[in-house]
């Protein structure tokens, strides 16, 4: 087995949101949403440190009050991934200023969505596992999760689908229902071929060098067409290992999602 790399979890938390302004501070059972995400991520034993990355003083003040570690990032990032990379650089500088070595290029940085307060910590453990695989862990640069979905879910362009190679690396991500069944109808998955459709779960783990490479690449043509930033990696020859999961989570896109989350949290605690 490959030696386990140092793993850091970073939760990007942006106040501005067209559909839900102030989302990270949304009250869920008496605590802000980012607190729930942090508490769940901190339960992942493989993560040596979890921090919030924000550009907003209101979020920073709430994090300070609740003893949630945070770093302040620039407000002009085009994506959460760019914010995560800046936060990783800041963590490295903090280590260096304390007399320790900074983050090595093979360190693993996990981008933990700040609107997933019902996140199961076991998903994060699954996400970082490929980096230590005995066969090819050393070559894994980026990893993400996917789960089996049915045809109705696959038909929605809001549900991103992924197809993979035999070794588990992503071949393509799309909003279209892939793979297409040429003979009509929907092909049910079988034991050999796997499920008919894999739905992408938007958690990512990067080697630091791959995260840096992503931020230095221009948006790609397929990325612009599908509005999926992970295609930038594939178009530039950076492989993404796809890990199957059976754990479900539920993101918060709109205020009305809060009630669903409260019910999920109650079920999980019960």
Swiss-Prot record:
A UniProt-annotated Pfam family: CTP_transf_3
EC number(s) given by UniProt: 2.7.7.38
Record flagged with keyword Transferase: yes
GO cellular component: cytosol
Molecular function via GO: 3-deoxy-manno-octulosonate cytidylyltransferase activity
Function: Activates KDO (a required 8-carbon sugar) for incorporation into bacterial lipopolysaccharide in Gram-negative bacteria.
Protein name: 3-deoxy-manno-octulosonate cytidylyltransferase
The organism of origin for this protein: Nitratidesulfovibrio vulgaris (strain DSM 19637 / Miyazaki F) (Desulfovibrio vulgaris)
Gene name as annotated: kdsB
């Amino acid at each position: 087995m490959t030696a386990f790399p140092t793993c850091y979890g970073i939760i990007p938390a942006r106040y501005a949101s067209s559909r839900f302004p102030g989302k990270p501070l949304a009250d869920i059972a008496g605590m802000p949403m980012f607190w729930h995400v942090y508490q769940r991520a901190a339960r992942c034993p493989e993560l040596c440190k979890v921090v919030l990355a924000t550009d907003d003083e209101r979020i920073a003040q709430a994090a300070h009050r609740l003893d949630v570690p945070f770093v302040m990032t620039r407000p002009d990032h085009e994506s959460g991934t760019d914010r995560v990379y800046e936060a990783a650089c800041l963590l490295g500088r903090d280590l260096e200023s304390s007399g320790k070595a900074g983050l090595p290029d093979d360190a693993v940085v996990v981008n933990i969505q700040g609107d997933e307060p019902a996140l199961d910590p076991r998903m994060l453990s699954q996400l970082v596992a490929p980096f230590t695989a005995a066969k090819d862990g050393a070559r894994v640069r980026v990893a993400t999760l996917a789960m089996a979905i049915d045809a109705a879910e696959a038909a929605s362009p809001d549900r991103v689908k992924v197809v993979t190679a035999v070794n588990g690396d992503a071949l393509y991500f799309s909003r279209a229902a892939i793979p297409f069944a040429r003979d009509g109808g929907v092909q049910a998955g079988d034991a050999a071929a796997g499920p008919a459709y894999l739905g992408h779960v938007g958690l990512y783990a990067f080697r630091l060098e791959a995260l840096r490479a992503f931020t230095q690449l221009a948006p790609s043509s397929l990325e612009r067409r599908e509005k999926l930033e992970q295609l930038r990696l594939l178009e530039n020859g950076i492989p993404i290992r796809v890990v199957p999961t059976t754990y479900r989570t539920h993101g918060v896109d709109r205020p009305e999602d809060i009630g669903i989350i409260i019910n999920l949290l109650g079920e999980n605690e019960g």
